[in-house]
Amino acid sequence: MTGKRIKDSSVTIAQVMIPQDVNPAGNVHGGVIMKLIDTAAAVVASRHSRCNTVTVSIDRLDFHYPVFVGDLLFFKASLNMVGRTSMEVGVRVEAENLITGEVRHTASAYLTFVALDKDGRPRAVPPLIVETDDEKRRNREAKTRREMRLAERKQEEQCQLDPGSCT
């Protein structure tokens, strides 16, 4: 299988926040932003694998600043790492105030997707071609996150087998 470059599947999606997106506190509801993060990441995973993909985990989602009605959000999504059937996508969310021009980094997330064949089973994905120093750094960090996720999963399985071993 031929490798693919990160820039060939990366996307930036722009969306203006509207009154229907607001929570009772007057900020854009976090769930609205989460859905758009998942959508942007899914586009990247599907562009890389050229098949259906499913979100299997959100490793981390951090909200840094509130988002308001009228803000133009940019969801910048790109692959960080691929495994045999899985892909980690990083998403950076920036909000632009259309009146002042101020741009704020409002959220970041890491999502893992699995590619599916026509029968809904995991299928192999193309290898990732990592070119720039930034891509290499993000790839290393993604591999570290993957190792931590696998260790956590192993610990959870052990706890289910022997609840007394978990304190």
Predicted region positions:
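Residue-level recognition of specific faces of alpha-helices
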Residues: 14, 33, 57-60
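N-terminal glycine-rich phosphate/pyrophosphate-binding loops that anchor nucleotide-derived ligands
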Residues: 2-4
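A short small-residue
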Residues: 16-22
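Hydrophobic beta-strand-centered segment that forms part of the acyl-chain substrate-binding groove
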Residues: 6-8, 28, 39-76, 80-82, ...
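Amphipathic, well-packed alpha-helical segments that form the structural scaffold of globular domains
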Residues: 15-16, 38
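A conserved, well-ordered hydrophobic junction motif at loop->secondary-structure transitions
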Residues: 22-35, 166-167
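HotDog/MaoC-like acyl-thioester-processing domains
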Residues: 7-13, 68-69, 80-167
